[in-house]
Amino acid sequence: MTEAATSTVIRDATQADLPAMAEIYDEQVRSSIATFETEPRGAAYLGEKLAHPAPGDFMLVVMRDRVVLGYAYSGPFRPRPAYAGTKEVSVYVAAAARGQGLGRMLYAALLARLDALPDVHTQVAVVALPNDASEALHLGAGFVRVGVLREVGHKFGRYIDSAWYQRLP
């Protein structure tokens, strides 16, 4: 468990956290391009990720005063075996808690765990554009922007580009 301030805690997610995590994610689905989901997924979606982790798959929450304010996770980049050393990472923070450094804290904890695994070589993150805050978060966590895929998503009546970020040892 990592404590960043007196009442801010980062820890492994549990089943009890899933409703709050789903609320954070589903708000992003409904109101932003941070995810290309177009319909809310609910707690069952995140529960599947939590219940069936592969080696190097982590799901962390950040809490303040016992309230889940965000989460980060790592998962497979692609299903083929040769990609096993590459993890895709994501972070989501509740709208009311953004700008407080919680995403940075979550990534620091998540990336430290991944760095400790000899079989995990690199991490990849995908950022829908424009998103200055997310791009700054990834650059600050040691990621490098390696490319942009143009107009690969369609949400809210428009096409959206995705920037690809990679973090190497």
Positions of the model-derived regions?
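Acetyl-CoA-dependent GNAT
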Residues: 39-96, 107-108, 113, 168
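Conserved GNAT acetyl-CoA-binding A-motif
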Residues: 114-127
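A short beta-loop-alpha structural element at the N-terminal edge
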Residues: 9-21
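Conserved GNAT-fold acetyl-CoA-binding loop/helix
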Residues: 22-49
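Conserved beta-strand-loop-alpha-helix junction that forms the acyl-donor binding cleft
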Residues: 98, 124-135
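Conserved acetyl-CoA-binding loop-helix of GNAT-fold acetyltransferases
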Residues: 99-114, 135-140
